[in-house]
Amino acid sequence: LAERIADGGYEPIHTCAINLSGATIGDDTFLDFLREVQPRYGIEPSSVCFEITETSAIANLVNATPFIQELKALGYRFSLDDFCAGMSSFVYLKHLPVDYLKIDGSFIKDMLEDPIDRAMVQVINQIGHVMGKRTVAEFVETQEILEVLREIGIDYAQGYGLARPQPFNRNFLRETHVAAVASDTTSGR
């Protein structure tokens, strides 16, 4: 992708989210690779958001914090994926320097019928914002869920209700867009 964008084959993209495996945490060769390819292809680090699951980050907490700090020092953003799906603890969250909390879809999908799920989403969103993190709701499949997420103040959403997964090709880059949920994306949240 970086090669194609650098060669003028694709339009630059606003944000590219890349899932990392738990094995990547603490892998110095990965950091070296990023340091090498960034100047070669002119990758704007702020346009890349690395994602790691909460379970992987907590299982590797000793390495996760410095690894995330190093990525952020290089200008990349970081997201904690599937938050509250596994071993969640706000103690861990307090020490992980992530930019985004991706609220696990298991809370989102039934939040219209289940007041506990809705309350969990509200609380995670509030705590995330107090900590200076943006929130992302996974598994958004209906307009009704999207509207409730807007009311709650969730920053971003992803799911079939917004766009279906697509093969990666030239048209994908032209047609894809990120859905901001917050009614005022300049609010600083």
Regions found by a protein language model. Give the residues of each.
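EAL-family c-di-GMP phosphodiesterase catalytic domain
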Residues: 4-5, 9, 19-28, 47-61, ...
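A short, hydrophobic coiled-coil helix within the histidine kinase transmitter core
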Residues: 33-37
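Acidic, serine/threonine- and proline-rich low-complexity intrinsically disordered segments
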Residues: 64-65
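Catalytic core regions of nucleotide second-messenger enzymes
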Residues: 6-14, 42
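Conserved C-terminal helical docking segment of ANL/AMP-forming enzymes
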Residues: 38, 44-46
